[in-house]
Amino acid sequence: DGREKEKEYGTYEIPGLKNTRTLLTAKGATPAMCTSMTPQGLAITEDYVMISAYCSTQKHNSVIYVIGKESHNFIKEVILPGQPHVGGLAYDPDHKILWYSSNINGIAQAVSIKMDTIEAYDYDESHLPVDTFQTVSLYGIVRDSFMTFYKGCLYVGCFEKYNESVIARYGVDAEGNLIDTMDEELGMNFEMAVPLDYSTISEQAQGIAFYNDKLLISHSFGILPSRLVVYEQSDKRLYVNENSARTYRFPERLEQIVVEGDNLYVMFES
């Protein structure tokens, strides 16, 4: 049926673009079919390819599509609470936890779900959003547009159209929780995760990934050709165009990227 050829070329079909089972946000647990899902984030686990998507009409709950890594077949949709943009997904393999980007009242947040919870989730049985594990507000970053997990830390980046931006690095404890604190000197009046450090990046960044001693950043905006830019990791943490080691040109709308082993996974919005 052509699947073997598709598998050979390493492609995964993004499900749910024509219609996705989800919930009508304004009516709680009311099942609904969304025809306007926009794919955003990408994560790779031991067994799955996971893609996040949000409703562009702002009527339905956001979702995560779970795809078999070896079979390339769609397994199920996981309904998220509310309508986060879910621009970023990140997988913590040590604690078997999936992170996704969200926000509340204009404050960037990172939300985690245990993989056991994702595997046990059944839309037909519950017609409810999945149970989350931890929700943490992020200090020091305007939006969490994309993210990745690397060497025990969650890296979160912010998309800017025309200006340089940042990647913030946040620590995780032994249980897989983001470490948060209440620091009044930083102007907080509730607990937030505080970055261990920042890196400067060029504009229009959509995704980040690490490979050996290199940092990879995807850049795209609208219908313009996309770029994948490779940098040598540096203590200066200044990853802007003029410091790049190599640049690759990609078709438009390149979104999140993930490195697993020696393989690079890239996702396109449309």
Identify the role of each PLM range:
Residues 38, 63-97:
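Blade-loop segments of beta-propeller domains
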Residues 200-201, 237-261:
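Conserved blade-ending motifs and adjacent loop-strand segments that build the rim/top face
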Residues 30-35, 78-82, 135-140, 196-201, ...:
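Surface loop/turn motifs at the tips and blade-to-blade linkers of beta-strand repeat domains
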Residues 1-30, 270:
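Sequence/structural signature of beta-propeller modules
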Residues 21-60:
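Beta-strand-rich domains and repeat architectures in extracellular enzymes and scaffolds
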Residues 58-65, 106-117, 162-175, 223-233, ...:
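Structural motif
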